[in-house]
Amino acid sequence: MGEIFVAGVNFKVAPVEVREKLACSLEETKKVLPILKRETPLEEVMLLSTCNRVEVYAYNFVENSEDLINKLLEIKRLNPSFKRYFFVKRGEEAVYHIFKVASSLDSMVIGEPQIVAQFKEAYRVAKEAGTVGKILNRVYEKALRASKRVRTETGISRSAVSVSYAAVELAKKIFGDLKEAKVLLIGAGEMGELAANYLRRFGAKLHITNRTYERALKLVKELSGNVLRFEELKEYLPLMDIVIVSTGAKDYILKREDFERSVRERHYEPQFVIDIAVPRNVDPEAGNVEGVFLYDIDDLKQVVEENLKERIKEAQRGEIILWDEVKKFMNWYESLKAEPYILELKASVEGKEVSPYIKKLVHRAIKEIKRNPEVADIILRIFKEVEKNEPRRKELSNVYNGTHGA
């Protein structure tokens, strides 16, 4: 039999400037896979390329792993010195790695959901290219099973691990249902946009303002919502349940007195303020106003760090699940070694006149080989010896029965 193996680079072993040179687009992957199968000793191969990893999952690589790595570097027109960044895993260790990747336990952010879709896409491309077969089909199926178990039986994806999503989680704690909540996004910072987009997905009503009106209009097209003029910001402030501030201003654009007026007009209904700007755009004193819940980027990062610690604990539980699934897979994989022996045993009796003794022996031999494939060769040799001596055994049995019958 061949061997399951993994070769590649990821964020743990190679910097981004190396990973980006090896990265393959969808169209590139479609071209690379047939070349790898045709020009290296591979029976099956798939390639997973994301921003954090470029990994080849393969079967029947029985020669030096450098053959594959050299071919990949040749395709990407890279210097052989890049080989030093590659890692190689074989057999059970390779299967565990694939399952771990698909379960997001090997991700930079443990529990992130994107990797499952990326793994499925990598398999789809390989299947369409005709470069996967019996072994990698099974690896894929069981990797997804492992991934599902990890997500449903642990809490790796329950808590927010991005600053933007942490802001949304805090907003939900304060307001409960976010449907119909009015959100004001001030500025065009990336994290602010992400937080606003998350809130919109939960049904919040989005309002956007920016010093540059055209930029606000552009954001409205991307996120949907209403545009407010920046100079009217303080007039609209009391109407907003959630305020996200993410501008490039060097000083405070909202001060304590702005929120004192705002909560009075809101009759002290809670107002959630997220200041993701660096330097901060909201006077920290605003957090002391009754009804105002002010969080800056450090507050959110603290939430994220606590959540990450919790995910790491859950990941340890996930690894136990992975090893359980790897063991099941390896039992199936090892059983494949016995298939030729089982077929040979079956062929020895099918369509032939054989004694019940031989039939019983074949049945027992097959059962034992399935239970322990390592002994298949020995069992087959013993069976052939018994089968060869079967005529002599019959003759002796007849003589014995004749003597006793006389």
Curated annotation (Swiss-Prot):
Pfam families: GlutR_N, Shikimate_DH. GO terms for molecular function: glutamyl-tRNA reductase activity; NADP binding. NADP(+) binds at G187, A188, G189, E190, M191, G192. The active site is at C51 (nucleophile). The keyword Repeat does not apply. The keyword Oxidoreductase applies. Pathway: Porphyrin-containing compound metabolism; protoporphyrin-IX biosynthesis; 5-aminolevulinate from L-glutamyl-tRNA(Glu): step 1/2. Substrate binds at T50, C51, N52, R53, S107, E112, P113, Q114, Q118. It catalyses: (S)-4-amino-5-oxopentanoate + tRNA(Glu) + NADP(+) = L-glutamyl-tRNA(Glu) + NADPH + H(+). CDD domains: NAD_bind_Glutamyl_tRNA_reduct. Its EC number is 1.2.1.70. One of its GO terms (biological process) is protoporphyrinogen IX biosynthetic process from glutamate. During catalysis, the active site Cys acts as a nucleophile attacking the alpha-carbonyl group of tRNA-bound glutamate with the formation of a thioester intermediate between enzyme and glutamate, and the concomitant release of tRNA(Glu). The thioester intermediate is finally reduced by direct hydride transfer from NADPH, to form the product GSA. Belongs to the glutamyl-tRNA reductase family. Homodimer. Possesses an unusual extended V-shaped dimeric structure with each monomer consisting of three distinct domains arranged along a curved 'spinal' alpha-helix. The N-terminal catalytic domain specifically recognizes the glutamate moiety of the substrate. The second domain is the NADPH-binding domain, and the third C-terminal domain is responsible for dimerization. PANTHER family: GLUTAMYL-TRNA REDUCTASE. Catalyzes the NADPH-dependent reduction of glutamyl-tRNA(Glu) to glutamate 1-semialdehyde (GSA). This is Glutamyl-tRNA reductase. It comes from Aquifex aeolicus (strain VF5).
